[in-house]
């Protein structure tokens, strides 16, 4: 008698809890003091011609249709996360005031939830919020930075670099991985 035993490993599920672009362009690499450039960066942030919506829309589409396939886990349906009452009622620690909120462009119904060095309270509380449905939570954002280009004399070109940060936390709010990709 020949018997076969098949073990089916259930794929983990993850909730994407942030998806935003940071409109405050970093300028440290230019080597110019912040007092000279901060006004220009704020003017750029507030300029309606500096429209990051199409870029964020394209990144969102690519992320969910292409990039997500490379993850070793499945993503919960987006609407079940961002449109849920518990997500909409979630109030992150270090919530943004109206002035600081201008720095971020959230995609759709996503909220800005700080993740990082001082974000432990947010990471743990939002992970626990989805612990019944998901094995973890994913924070996704795009940052921009000016870089020095080619220069002669006192003139130079400036390039802009886009960097995405993707950070995964388990259902306890412990970091599994985080990476930045240009």
Where are these predicted regions, by residue range?
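Short N-terminal segments immediately surrounding and downstream of signal-peptide cleavage
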Residues: 10-24
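Short, solvent-exposed loop/turn and secondary-structure capping segments
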Residues: 27-28
